[in-house]
Every structure is written in C-alpha cells, then in structure tokens.
C-alpha cells in the first residue's frame, strides 16, 4: 500500500471508491429487504432486485461511451451527487411507506422504490466506468497494474463483504438507517473526488453517443474472444441474480433468518 501513502490523488480515488462501494453493498441488502417489508409478493420483490441490475444490462456500453466523451471527474462527482439525492429519497420511502403496505398501495410503493433503484444502478454504472478509466491519469504507468488491483479489491471488499452485513445490523436497528448511511457515504465520496487533481485530456471530437454505441457493438461482435467473454459473464450474472432476487424471501420464510443473519449469509 506504499502507493496509497505517497500519491495523494490515488489515495483520494481509492478512499472515494471504498466509501462509494460501501454504499452499493449496503443497498444490495437494504433495497430487497425494504421491498419484503412493504409486500410479500415475490414478483414485486423481484422487481426491485431486477431494477437494481437493469441499468448494467442496458447502459454499460453507453456509459463507457459517455466516459470517453466527457470529463471523468465531473461524471464521478455528478453520479455520487445523484446517488446521494436518490438514497435520501429512499430514506423518505422507508419513513413514510406503511410496512406492510395495503394491497393497493404496495404496487405503487414498489414502483417508486424500483424507480429509485434503477436510477441508483444507472449512476453506479457511470461512476464505476469513470473511476476505472480515470486511474491512468492518477498513477504512473509503472504503478497502473498494482493500483488497478488494489482498486478492484477494495471495491469487492466494501461492496460484497462489508456492505451487506453492515446493512443487516443497521436495518435491525432502524429500517431507514442503511439509506441514511448511503446518503452520507455518497456525500463523502463526492467531496473526495472533488479534490482529486486530474490532468486535462486532449480535446475529444464529440460525436453522437448512439453512433459510438453502434460502433462499439460492431467492434465487440468482430472480436470473438471478447464477445464470448461478455456473453459468458452475462449468463453468470443473470443466473446469480435469479438466486439473489428471491433469496430475501427464502431467508425469511424457509431459513427463518433475521435481517442480521441474512446480511451474513450474503457474504
């Protein structure tokens, strides 16, 4: 971790990614659990889980194009500000939506939560793309491989190993608590990214985003290994989501787990 202590800009980027991905990990448990408190309908609960990942499916390539065309620091700051606002909206939802909600109101409530979840996923796609591509501007070429490994590792640790169990403990204390933590984490990440000094990039010729997306799709199709890798990872993620989508009900109704225990199950 020598690089962390000697490179201020990398330290800020690393810390911002850690805090930001902690918020993502907290949301991964908190959103489906909130849905299960609102309704016991598996389809409605699955809608919330589906919405959180839908943005990755439909917006990954457009987000990459946008990252190439626009200032990456501004994209990261904007994405974290948007996520801060959206999670504040989830705090309001957790405080105001009846738990459980009446049958007629549950559908509307789930649609609201799903909409916020989708927008959170959309901001996450843009933010994570920008964070990965800005790294070469923050560290020397000789440190790039090590820095990329460290950045990926902290994202996985915070998002997959710390975030979900922490969310479980917070929900056990108060349902809005994980979303309050999310709001604060994204606010902190915004401040860290704001102070990163990133050299200006050469001017980019702006073209239609959709034209760039089509060109990227053609490029992927013409590179067989990349196409096969993308399809394989897509299928793996889809199968994983089939489990995660309904796992919250399985934990509650079959295993009889508390929210704290469910958080530990997700590690």
Predicted regions mapped to residue ranges:
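Alpha-helical transmembrane-bundle signature of multi-pass membrane transport and export proteins
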Residues: 1-267
């Amino acid at each position: 971790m020598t690089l962390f202590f000697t490179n201020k800009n990398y330290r800020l980027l690393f810390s911002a990614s850690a805090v930001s991905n902690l918020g993502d990990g907290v949301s991964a448990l908190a959103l489906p659990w909130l849905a299960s408190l609102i309704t016991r309908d598996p389809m409605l609960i699955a809608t919330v889980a589906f919405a959180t990942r839908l943005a990755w499916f439909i917006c990954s390539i457009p987000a990459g194009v946008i990252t190439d065309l626009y200032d990456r620091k501004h994209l990261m700051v904007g994405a974290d500000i948007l996520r801060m606002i959206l999670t504040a909206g989830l705090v309001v939802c957790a405080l105001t939506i009846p738990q459980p909600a009446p049958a007629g109101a549950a559908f509307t409530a789930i649609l609201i939560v799903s909409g916020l979840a989708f927008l959170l996923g959309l901001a996450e796609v843009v933010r994570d793309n920008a964070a990965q591509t800005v790294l070469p501007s923050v560290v020397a070429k000789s440190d790039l491989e090590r820095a990329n490994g460290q950045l990926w590792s902290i994202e996985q640790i915070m998002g997959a190993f710390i975030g979900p169990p922490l969310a479980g403990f917070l929900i056990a204390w108060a349902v809005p608590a994980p979303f309050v933590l999310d709001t604060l984490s994204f606010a902190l990440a915004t401040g860290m990214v704001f102070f990163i000094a990133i050299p200006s990039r050469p001017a980019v010729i702006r073209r239609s985003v959709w034209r760039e997306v089509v060109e990227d799709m053609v490029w992927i199709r013409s590179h067989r290994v990349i196409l096969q890798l993308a399809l394989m990872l897509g299928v793996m993620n889809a199968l994983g989501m089939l489990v995660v989508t309904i796992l919250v009900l399985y934990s509650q109704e079959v295993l009889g787990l508390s929210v704290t225990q469910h958080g530990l199950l997700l590690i």
